[in-house]
UniProtKB/Swiss-Prot annotation:
Record's keyword terms, sorted: Cell inner membrane, Cell membrane, GTP-binding, Hydrolase, Membrane, Nucleotide-binding, Protein biosynthesis
Domain tr-type G: 2-184
GO molecular function, one term: GTPase activity
Name listed for the protein in its UniProt record: Elongation factor 4
Family (UniProt): Belongs to the TRAFAC class translation factor GTPase superfamily. Classic translation factor GTPase family. LepA subfamily.
Pfam families noted in UniProt: EFG_C, GTP_EFTU, GTP_EFTU_D2, LepA_C
Record: residues binding GTP: D14, H15, G16, K17, S18, T19, N131, K132, I133, D134
Entry function: Required for accurate and efficient protein synthesis under certain stress conditions. May act as a fidelity factor of the translation reaction, by catalyzing a one-codon backward translocation of tRNAs on improperly translocated ribosomes. Back-translocation proceeds from a post-translocation (POST) complex to a pre-translocation (PRE) complex, thus giving elongation factor G a second chance to translocate the tRNAs correctly. Binds to ribosomes in a GTP-dependent manner.
Membrane spanning residue stretches: none
SUPFAM superfamilies documented for this protein: EF-G C-terminal domain-like (SSF54980), P-loop containing nucleoside triphosphate hydrolases (SSF52540), Translation proteins (SSF50447)
PANTHER family membership: TRANSLATION FACTOR GUF1 HOMOLOG, CHLOROPLASTIC, TRANSLATION FACTOR GUF1-RELATED
Topology term for the membrane: Peripheral membrane protein
EC supergroup of this enzyme: hydrolase
Length: 596
């Protein structure tokens, strides 16, 4: 056991986690030169295209150190994006240490801090590594100072490497062996294995990635899942080297996979404990805290026949993504679908893209909303995440919106722009600290503002240099109202949104004008209105297409023309009473992109 090292690789987006992982695999001979693909561990198409890591992946490597001993390194490549921070905390629960990778050109960024604090809270040893020293703008000495100054861990003698060229990779491996402690656990004790991740394979059933904390799990053992109490037989156990490799057993301290032919999707929930069916452990291991979705949106299949396959797809995804929450929803405009909870906008985009790609579904998304706390006049408190579930205005005593604490790191020349943006988003500044060239800003912002387009605008006002991370702090009373869009006097439920009172006029006008552009002209006039309660605050009309009915009259009496025009007018009036308007798909998406 003293030759096992379990560690995660944590870093901000684009600081080179996945490339470093590739390099470590290559160095330890996990794959031949021919099999080395860039970003070996990013196996999803979306991950490769966007160049981001979404799912944490694990790899087991053998490394012959300078002291002549062979060490088993189990490492987990983690995502860097703020939306996937729960993936990071799950991966850390399976390790004893973490490599904090920092780009020697960019320096410390917000996510570096957030992930590092997560690791320190779990009492882990954090080993800083300066990556990308081959870049012309790399300044490792300045960055090492920055790490000590902002993060507060020793970094003067941090390893310097370049994952791209392979310089200093040996040193990284040596540091891992020297500085990260071996796992602790009782090899003789009853089996306790923590499920770090599980996913569904259509041939093998549920594949679970586990970390053995105590005891040994052999192939053919009968084990039970502690939360459900169901028994299964381990058909195959093994490790990823990154290829699936079967082994006869998994020993204490190791990280590997178990396949037990579990066919139902929630048979092995993430964060659960496995133990032997007979003489098993009595206590489960402490799991992970459940992540609460922050953003909700309705997803509807374009053709109603896809509803069943949409539900199956969601079930399969939710096995692999513990943070996904969904419930059925119906909309008069869009039919049957699901209300889905996400961790953030990137998460929402990724899930929608995975559903469309991996399960061939065509989906419509409604505008994302956050959860509001509402105190009704009868004294009870309810939580609403869907604008159409909002009680009538006269039943609402008080509406409270979620406030997030946002930590922003930004170079000082862009500070003014960022402050202007935060003020525009109704933010309250709580802290501002200078660290050399960087400024750390802390703002309390309404989550609804952060969710919509804050990230993109922050990046554009700071030319991409600012970085942020946020967490929910509390609900706070706010003047929020529901803005409805009426088309020909009918409310379209999928276009409703909850917004701040100060923005009603501008938002209402913008929406109405956008709808006017997007809804095709009909044979009769269409009124598009924005309303709050029964008060109309903006309106525009989509003019009817009209046929020139008097074209065939040449000369003759004017009463002839009048008769034809009157006949047309009556027809249009009748049409308007019975006609209904199809709202095109683009109109629903327009709500999301109002600020562009």
């Amino acid at each position: 056991m003293k030759h096992i090292r379990n560690f995660s690789i944590i870093a901000h987006i684009d600081h080179g986690k996945s490339t470093l992982s590739d390099r470590l695999i290559h160095e330890c001979g996990g794959l031949t030169d021919r099999e080395m693909a860039a970003q070996v561990l990013d196996s999803m198409d979306i991950e490769r295209e966007r160049g981001i890591t979404i799912k944490a992946q694990s790899v087991t490597l053998d490394y012959k150190a300078n002291d002549g001993e062979t060490y088993q390194l189990n490492f987990i490549d983690t995502p860097g994006h703020v939306d996937f921070s729960y993936e990071v905390s799950r991966s850390l629960a399976a390790c004893e240490g973490a490599l904090l990778v920092v780009d020697a050109g960019q320096g410390v960024e917000a996510q570096t801090l957030a992930n590092c604090y997560t690791a320190l809270e779990m009492d882990m040893d954090v080993v800083p590594v300066l990556n990308k020293i081959d870049l012309p703008q790399a300044d490792p000495d300045r960055v090492a100072e920055e790490i000590e100054d902002i993060v507060g861990i020793e970094a003067a003698d941090a390893v310097r490497c370049s994952a791209k060229t392979g310089v200093g990779i040996k040193d990284v491996l040596e540091v891992i062996v020297e500085q990260i402690p071996p796992p602790e656990g009782d090899e003789e004790g009853p089996l306790q294995a923590l499920i770090i991740d599980s996913w569904f394979d259509s041939y093998l059933g549920v594949v679970s990635l586990v970390r053995i904390k105590n005891g040994v799990l052999k192939k053919g053992d009968k084990f039970k899942v502690m939360s459900t109490g169901q028994n299964h037989t381990a058909d195959r156990v093994g490790i990823f080297t990154p290829k699936q490799t079967d082994t006869p057993e998994l020993k204490t301290g190791e990280v590997g996979f178990v396949i037990a032919g579990i066919k139902e999707i929630h048979g092995a929930p993430v964060g659960d404990t496995l133990t032997h069916a007979k003489h098993g452990a009595l206590e489960p291991l402490p799991g992970f805290k459940k992540v609460k979705p922050q953003v909700y949106a309705g997803l509807f299949p374009i053709s109603t026949d896809d509803y069943e396959s949409f539900r199956d797809a969601l079930n399969k995804l939710s096995l692999n993504d513990a943070s996904l929450f969904f419930e059925p929803e119906t909309s008069s405009a869009l039919g049957f679908g699901f209300r889905i909870g996400f961790l953030g906008l990137l998460h929402m985009e990724i899930i929608q893209e995975r559903l469309e790609r991996e399960y061939n579904l065509e989906l419509i998304t409604t505008a994302p909303t956050v959860v509001y706390e509402i105190v009704q006049t009868n004294g009870e408190t309810i939580y609403v995440d869907n604008p159409s579930d909002l009680p009538a205005i006269n039943n609402i005593e008080e509406m409270r919106e979620p406030i997030v604490e946002t930590n922003i790191l930004v170079p000082k020349e862009y500070l003014g722009n960022v402050i202007t943006l935060c003020v525009e988003k109704r933010g309250v500044q709580t802290n501002l600290v200078y660290h050399g060239n960087q400024v750390a800003l802390t703002y309390e912002l309404p989550m609804a503002e952060v969710v919509m387009d804050f990230f993109d605008r922050l990046k554009s006002t700071s030319r991409g240099y600012a970085s942020l991370e946020y967490n929910f702090v509390r609900f706070e009373p706010a003047d929020m109202v529901r803005l409805d869009i009426l088309i020909n006097g009918d409310r379209v439920d999928a276009l409703a949104m909850i917004i701040h009172k100060g923005l009603i006029r501008s938002k209402g006008l913008a929406l109405v004008n956008k709808m006017k552009e997007l809804i095709p002209r009909q044979m009769f006039d269409i009124a598009v209105q924005a309303a709050v309660g029964s008060q109309i605050i903006a309106r525009s009309s989509i003019k009817a297409m009209r046929k020139d009915v008097t074209a065939k009259c040449y000369g003759g009496d004017v009463s002839r023309k009048k008769k034809l025009l009157q006949k047309q007018k009556d027809g249009k009036k009748r049409m308007k009473q019975v006609g209904n308007v199809e709202v095109p798909q683009e109109a629903f998406l327009a709500v999301l992109k109002l600020n562009d």
